[in-house]
Curated annotation (Swiss-Prot):
Disulfide cysteine pairs (residue numbers): none
Positions with biased composition (Polar residues): 33-43
Gene3D superfamilies in UniProt: Stage III sporulation protein AH-like
GO term, biological process aspect, one: sporulation resulting in formation of a cellular spore
Keyword Transmembrane helix part of the UniProt annotation: yes
Purpose: Involved in forespore engulfment. Forms a channel with SpoIIIAH that is open on the forespore end and closed (or gated) on the mother cell end. This allows sigma-E-directed gene expression in the mother-cell compartment of the sporangium to trigger the activation of sigma-G forespore-specific gene expression by a pathway of intercellular signaling.
Biased composition (Basic and acidic residues): 48-92
Keywords assigned by UniProt, alphabetized: Cell membrane, Membrane, Sporulation, Transmembrane, Transmembrane helix
Subunit structure, as described in the record: Interacts with SpoIIQ.
Topological type in the membrane: Single-pass membrane protein
Protein's recorded name: Stage III sporulation protein AH
Record localization: Cell membrane
Species the sequence originates in: Bacillus subtilis (strain 168)
Principal localisation: membrane
Length: 218
């Protein structure tokens, strides 16, 4: 009985082995394997297709960054334009300052003249106070100091007189027999200059030469 069972088991095992070999070697099995491979490839394609939008997102992101870069570039251009406008405005302000300096021309003239007169007065005073100077030198220096004070008084008087004629400002510089007059006025003519000369002649009888110059107020 045991031998029969053993033979039966061996027979069944042999049959299973034969069927397995037949199944593997049959065309249908190959087709099944091919279909399985195609299915796997198809699944892989789906995965690849699903991952593709990620690249598209990257492109969209790059596009967004590009647009942002353009906006930044445009903003930078606007900033540059603003800087140019600011630079142009600063340049115009610099021109205004130059014009203001022209308005201060009379102040500069006066300061220069006062400095020159102050140095001259110091030199004359040094001679008067010097122990080495002779009596004649001291007397001459003193006379020059007195004359200088008189000239300064005459200049102030003439400046005030000219401004009463409607002029904004006037600068008078008397050097010996010559008087240089600078008048601040936007309008000037030969007749106006002649009128100023006649006005000065009435105040200074001994004058020989008078020069009148007009400077614009702006």
């Amino acid at each position: 009985m045991l031998k029969k069972q053993t033979v039966w088991l061996l027979t069944m095992l042999s049959l299973v082995v034969v069927l397995s070999v037949y199944y593997i070697m049959s065309p249908e099995s190959k087709n099944a394997v091919q279909m399985q491979s195609e299915k796997s490839a198809s699944d892989s394609g789906e995965v690849a297709t699903e991952k593709a939008p990620a690249k598209q997102d990257t492109k969209e992101k790059s596009g967004t960054e590009t647009e942002k870069g353009k906006e930044d570039g445009t903003k930078g251009t606007k900033d540059s334009s603003a800087d140019k406008e600011t630079s142009a405005e600063a340049s115009e302000k610099g021109t205004v300052v130059t014009e203001t300096a022209d308005d201060d021309l009379f102040t500069t003239y006066r300061l220069d003249l006062e400095d020159a007169r102050s140095k001259e007065r110091e030199e004359l005073n040094a001679i008067v106070s010097s122990d080495d100077a002779t009596a004649k030198e001291k007397s001459e220096a003193y006379d020059k100091m007195t004359a200088l004070s008189e000239v300064e008084g005459t200049e102030k008087q003439l400046e005030t007189l000219i401004k009463t004629q409607g002029y904004e400002d006037a600068l008078v510089n008397a050097e010996g027999d010559k008087i240089n007059i600078t008048v601040k006025s936007d309008k000037h003519s030969k007749s106006k200059a002649t009128a100023i000369i006649d006005l000065v002649a009435k105040e200074i009888k001994t004058m020989k030469d008078v020069a009148v110059t007009f400077e614009p107020s702006k």
